[in-house]
A protein has these predicted regions:
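Selective detector of the "anchor" transmembrane alpha-helix that sits immediately C-terminal
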Residues: 249-263
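Solvent-exposed, non-transmembrane regions of membrane-associated and secreted proteins
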Residues: 1-251
Length: 263
């Protein structure tokens, strides 16, 4: 009986860990967002204006230089623009809100392992998310990590859905314009598109595997309307949806726990 009890407790801990970790990460994310909002309200205009100018210069140079060195997010490249140099307390630069995914998360500069374990990240050698012509900020997130959803439900997004990026200067609305599946090596598929103001969401695909990338292209709201809902890319690959795998993972532990309790 003692052994059975120990096995039951071990199984229960294993079952509960993802939910506990998800609660912890989401709670920390909520605090980071609240801290971000406070800093935004209390911003030093001289420092913030200088930072904005430096970021614009960075984005312009990135476009002119052709984004040399861009690579897959899961190589965990470190950040190449440090906002701590401008008297900021942390690397939270913005927040992202995706109603269709019931997601609100802080956005960190640099797709490091640490940053990707606690939020959404800006891929190195892509535009900083401040908007503007000739920009494409590639925002990377795990397809679920240790119980935290992150971009797990990205397949819920459809063309026409709204995504909001809130940085220190403005709130920018983007509209999903196209969805593609690409290979990790196809970095040319996430480059800046001439004349466009974009963000691109990227995560692993299929779910629980990482040999492909699920990519959601989004253009700024006014551009989406002006262009007559035209897409930036044309997807060509037919792929299997991960929704069934996600559903099984979500409910199977409860079924197994119920069976364990009954028997």
């Amino acid at each position: 009986m003692v052994l059975v009890g120990i096995c039951f407790l071990a199984g229960l801990c294993y079952f509960l860990f993802p939910y506990f970790n998800s609660w912890m990460v989401n709670n920390d994310a909520k605090k980071e967002i609240e801290s971000f909002e406070v800093l935004k309200e209390e911003k030093n205009f001289d420092t913030h204006d200088l930072l904005f100018e430096m970021m614009e210069d960075y984005n312009n140079k990135l476009y002119k230089d052709g984004q040399n060195g861009i690579s897959d997010a899961w190589t965990f490249d470190q950040k190449d623009f440090v906002i701590g140099d401008y008297d900021f307390k942390n690397d939270v630069f913005a927040t992202i809100s995706i109603p269709k995914m019931n997601l609100e998360m802080p956005v960190y500069l640099g797709a490091s392992k640490e940053n990707m374990a606690k939020g959404i990240t800006v891929l190195a050698n892509t535009s900083l998310p401040i908007g503007g012509k000739n920009t494409n900020s590639v925002l990377a997130g795990h397809r679920g990590y240790r119980g935290v959803p992150f971009f797990r439900d990205i397949e819920n997004l459809q063309v026409g859905d709204e995504i909001t990026v809130n940085n220190y200067w403005q709130e920018i609305k983007y509209i999903v314009s196209d969805i593609q599946i690409i290979l990790p090596s196809e970095s040319e598929k996430i480059l800046i598109q001439e004349g466009k103001d974009m963000i691109t969401l990227i995560t692993c695909h299929p779910y629980r595997r990482n040999y492909q990338r699920y990519v959601v292209y989004c253009v700024r709201e006014d551009e989406y309307k002006k262009d007559g809902n035209s897409v930036v890319h044309q997807g060509s690959k037919v792929v299997k949806s991960s929704k069934n795998d996600i559903m099984i993972e979500r409910y199977l532990p409860f079924i197994l726990l119920l069976i364990l309790i009954i028997f």
